[in-house]
Amino acid sequence: MTKKRHLFTSESVTEGHPDKICDQISDSILDAILSKDANARVACETTVTTGLVLVAGEITTSTYVDIPKIVRETIQGIGYTRAKYGFDAETCAVLTSIDEQSADIAMGVDQALEAREGQMTDAEIEAIGAGDQGLMFGFACNETQELMPLPISLAHKLARRLTEVRKDDTLSYLRPDGKTQVTVEYDENGKPVRVDTIVISTQHHPDVTWEEIDRDLKEHVIKAVVPAELIDGETKFFINPTGRFVIGGPQGDAGLTGRKIIVDTYGGYARHGGGAFSGKDATKVDRSAAYAARYVAKNIVAAGLAEKAEVQLAYAIGVAQPVSISVDTFGTGKVSEDVLVELVRNNFDLRPAGIIKMLDLRRPIYKQTAAYGHFGRTDVDLSWERTDKAAALKEQAGL
């Protein structure tokens, strides 16, 4: 069946968005703990509103970290430094409510079901079962060099650029909160051919005019990020379409950890299992298995075994082996999906302990993922973005 030309849209947000503030606080706390106690169990949730930060969750660790100090340093780094913003690093209240991990959950994670029943030794599985049941997806496609869908790739780059021109004073009137959205047109073969629409909403100083913002963002943000060949005379631009965006950040909207899961992943282009990432250590398969699924999918595409690949993993709490592994190549595979699943089983250890070891996840690496996407990053070295398994997959597939 012939495909029709169609549009697809993805969005991103800046690090000053209320939900992203929360993600960064949660991951900053996680990193601080992991830097002193690599085996800590952390599930850290944050909420922000006008003048207030609440940090809650379950943390089991042998170390101590100064949570209010970490919170204030994170907010300072984002750029909320003035009380007139309705939220700033010095004057905001910080409340904490931290418990230890449930003993019932810890029992399942500490010693997986297979080990307790004698099916494997503790040494083989490193005594780690999945921290919860659930399903996770990973995706890759050959639309961009980083093997990500083009709409989310461009949306992230625009959001990052908004922050850059604010922090380096190119556009000193910008404030931390902002959102971007990109609509891409695909041809009959499913290939991206042009950018149809760009939406940017950015918080700003009250005295700047809309005309100035419109001109500056087109010149210093859009032109700097979006390849000129993707923009034509029909491309539509909506810059601060309400006309004014002065009240923003936690003063404008309350924020919560884990509320930007589509921004964090593939911009809606691939399926999502529902679990959020930030504030969770690697024994939580919501995070570690989603990273592993991306690693698998990216290596499949990098090996030339498919033009696009979506990998689903699923787990039961306290059980180390995934209960299911599936691969969907959307008709682009060079080998059957059954063969791909077998290749995945033979080349990737997808037990939680295996993932942690394979991707070296007991490190303080998470704050850098908490804004501008966890996947397709070229500005930081993330283990799940490497394509070091591609050659072996290609050889074993006989290609």
Swiss-Prot record:
Cofactor: Mg(2+); K(+)
Cofactor binding note of this UniProt entry: Binds 2 divalent ions per subunit. Binds 1 potassium ion per subunit.
UniProt keyword terms in alphabetical order: ATP-binding, Cytoplasm, Magnesium, Metal-binding, Nucleotide-binding, One-carbon metabolism, Potassium, Transferase
Enzyme Commission number(s) from the entry: 2.5.1.6
Binding site for ATP: H17, D177, G178, K179, R244, F245, D253, R259, K260, A276, K280
Reactions it catalyzes: L-methionine + ATP + H2O = S-adenosyl-L-methionine + phosphate + diphosphate
Residues annotated to bind L-methionine: E58, Q101, D253, K284
Transmembrane segments: none
GO biological process terms, semicolon-separated: one-carbon metabolic process; S-adenosylmethionine biosynthetic process
Residue sites binding K(+) per the record: E45
Protein location: Cytoplasm
Domain of life of the organism encoding this protein: Bacteria
Single GO MF annotation: methionine adenosyltransferase activity
InterPro entries the record matches: ADOMET_SYNTHASE_CS, S-AdoMet_synt_C, S-AdoMet_synt_central, S-AdoMet_synt_N, S-AdoMet_synthetase, S-AdoMet_synthetase_sfam
Sequence similarity: Belongs to the AdoMet synthase family.
Subunit structure: Homotetramer; dimer of dimers.
Cross-referenced HAMAP family: S_AdoMet_synth1
Official protein name in the record: S-adenosylmethionine synthase
Phylogenetic placement of the source organism: Bacteria, Bacillati, Bacillota, Bacilli, Bacillales
Annotated gene: metK
